[in-house]
């Protein structure tokens, strides 16, 4: 009887939880980022598409001798790269900056080769140079 009650509780909870999380699911969103080069006089902000949102995860309730369960992160599924030119760079300095543009996203393991797996930043734009705002790349 206890097994049946536990199964019923978990199945109803799963149905309720699947109706939609409180946070948006993993998806492409518009974000403003910054690009700069130490040799160029200005920093440029630009709008692009990144992956962000909630990925369902599980945590063991009881301590176990097993390794922790890997937690999925919102990461790129399909992407392409775009480039912008930093103005005012001196001769001999490459003024081009390339960045990924998310076409679609998925929940999966964190791969440091193409994702920033950290949490939210206190300051999303961090320019050491004077700011030249307003470029849009989607």
Swiss-Prot record:
Signal peptide span? 1-17
A GO cellular component term found in this entry reads:
cytoplasm
SUPFAM superfamilies the record matches: Cystine-knot cytokines (SSF57501)
Cite a single GO BP annotation.
Answer: G protein-coupled receptor signaling pathway
Q: Where in the cell is it found?
A: Secreted
Which keywords accompany this UniProt record? Answer: Disulfide bond, Glycoprotein, Hormone, Secreted, Signal
Glycosylated residues, chain numbering: 30
Give a short account of what the protein does: Promotes spermatogenesis and ovulation by stimulating the testes and ovaries to synthesize steroids.
Subunit description: Heterodimer of a common alpha chain and a unique beta chain which confers biological specificity to thyrotropin, lutropin, follitropin and gonadotropin.
Q: What is this protein called?
A: Lutropin subunit beta
């Amino acid at each position: 009887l206890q097994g049946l009650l536990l199964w019923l509780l978990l199945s109803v909870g799963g149905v309720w939880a699947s109706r939609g999380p409180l946070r948006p699911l993993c998806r492409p969103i518009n974000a403003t980022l910054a690009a700069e080069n130490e040799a160029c006089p200005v920093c440029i902000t630009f709008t692009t598409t990144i992956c962000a949102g909630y990925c369902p995860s599980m945590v063991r309730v009881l301590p176990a001798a097993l390794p922790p369960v890997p937690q999925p992160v919102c990461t790129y599924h399909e992407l392409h790269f775009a480039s912008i030119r930093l103005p005012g760079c001196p001769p001999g300095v490459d003024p081009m900056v390339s960045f990924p543009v998310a076409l679609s996203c998925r929940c999966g393991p964190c791969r440091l080769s193409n994702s920033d797996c950290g949490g939210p930043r206190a300051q999303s734009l961090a320019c050491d140079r004077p700011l030249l705002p307003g470029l849009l790349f989607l």
